């Protein structure tokens, strides 16, 4: 069974000098989901080391402090000197804020994918929905209730509770909409699972069948939540590349080696 560490190690390295906004605009979600990258980080060897360190952190073998130490050491070996931002800022690859962002985002994404991969039919029957809730305190928390309502409206409230709680069936399209950033949110990651946006502090917990029925989400067996199709598989990447055409594939090959299993 996949683990958070194995989910991270399975990702392809994607060196790029692009900013976060440019990555979001240029690289399809199917490819981002299958790749290990960081904005304005074109050094493949550093990314390989970061992937390994993040996998160690996701497995619990090392803590965040040790992970930051190892990544900072790798940056020094590479010769990094605050190339893209003031020291200590998020654009500074060696800042504590930036290193925490990389470690936490990779760990949280991997845990979500491993959790979904572990879902069985029996589990989905007993716990058909997720509840989105705050798990981490933030100095300036974003308005997730507003985002939820906008995403729910975008999918016509399909499989979504209508009582104001952020609860939806595990197979509801709202999770895809949240990750895609409906209403043009620019901080989202393009994934149908937490963390839906960078440094959001939001996560989900399972909701049992009795509560779902009380919310009107499971009136019959036909509306039981289905297992989401997360990918990311070579076939997903192949479809994305075919959709974008040969020019994009050549550009992608300049950024990273994505050839395995994709022709």
What feature does the model see in each segment?
Residues 1-199, 205-263:
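Domain-core detector
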